[in-house]
């Protein structure tokens, strides 16, 4: 949807908004309906051997996270190795894992605006993703207190290690499935028409991100954050000539 709130001789303001609602659900994984089919584990992660953190399961979204339900202490911190016995059999096994959120957003929103005043033009574009979750594999593979001090050396670890207080890895805990909704200011451009045939502009890209996600960047394609190279912030000075 595009609207022009102001349009005068020397001043024009245009606004554009688009909204997409996303929903997906797996309806069948076998040749014929089989309610007993457990699904297909996927989403390999770093740490351990053969660990998968996602599942394709009928009735659930694609690549849903498949994890243990973490139990927390009175101080709000997760208790190491303590999970909810969801099937009430008196022991914690893989049968106690459950489907917990998904990497795809519920809603994607795009917003752009452009203001022109005489020879000046200012434009900006923002994006928002709501309802998407990310498994923070960086944290799950580096937060262990037992690995912070080895061979008389202090090892590099993520700053969130003291919050979990885990001595050993808890790869399949839902503690590491984190809300990755975000708002990003993608681009701002300021342009000036020196003459009808000369235009100069300054552009800034990837300006800021607002999110509660604890990793580097919440925009992770497959929902598993594992050493993704962060996007750069760019500043561009340009000029265009029409002959």
Q: Each predicted region: which residue ranges?
A:
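Extracytoplasmic gating/loop element in the C-terminal half of outer-membrane beta-barrel translocons
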Residues: 77, 127-205
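Outer-membrane beta-barrel and related beta-rich outer-membrane complex signature
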Residues: 24-43, 131-156, 210-219
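Membrane-embedded beta-strand positions of outer-membrane beta-barrel proteins
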Residues: 15-17, 124, 200-202, 239
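Transmembrane beta-strands of outer-membrane beta-barrel pores
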Residues: 3-5, 19-25, 117-119, 128-132, ...
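C-terminal beta-signal and terminal closure region of outer-membrane beta-barrel proteins
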Residues: 40-66, 72-75, 153-155, 159, ...
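Residues that define the transmembrane beta-barrel architecture of outer-membrane proteins
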Residues: 11, 105-109, 177, 181-186, ...
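Repeated loop/turn-to-beta-strand initiation elements of outer-membrane beta-barrel proteins
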Residues: 9, 119-123, 198
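Conserved small-residue
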Residues: 4-103, 212
């Amino acid at each position: 949807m595009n609207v022009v709130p102001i349009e005068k001789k020397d001043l024009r303001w245009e606004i554009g908004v688009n909204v997409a609602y996303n929903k997906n659900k797996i309806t069948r994984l076998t040749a014929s309906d089989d309610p007993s089919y457990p699904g297909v584990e996927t989403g390999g992660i770093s740490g351990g051997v053969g660990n998968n953190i996602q599942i394709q399961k009928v009735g659930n979204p694609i690549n849903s996270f498949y994890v243990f339900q973490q139990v927390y202490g009175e101080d709000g911190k997760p208790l190491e190795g303590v999970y909810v016995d969801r099937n009430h059999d008196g022991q914690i096994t893989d049968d106690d894992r459950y489907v917990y959120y998904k990497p795809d957003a519920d809603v994607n929103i795009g917003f752009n605006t452009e203001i022109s005043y005489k020879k000046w033009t200012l434009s900006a574009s923002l994006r928002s993703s709501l309802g998407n979750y990310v498994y923070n594999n960086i944290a799950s593979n580096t937060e262990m207190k037992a690995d912070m001090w080895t061979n008389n050396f202090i090892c590099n670890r993520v700053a969130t290690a003291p919050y979990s207080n885990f001595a050993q890895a808890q790869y399949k805990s839902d503690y590491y499935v984190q809300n990755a909704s975000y708002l990003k200011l993608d681009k701002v451009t300021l342009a000036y028409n020196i003459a009808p045939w000369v235009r100069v502009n300054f552009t800034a890209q990837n300006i800021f991100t607002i999110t509660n996600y604890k990793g580097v960047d919440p925009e992770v394609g497959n929902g598993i954050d594992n050493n993704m190279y962060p996007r750069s912030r760019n500043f561009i000075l340009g000029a265009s000539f029409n002959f």
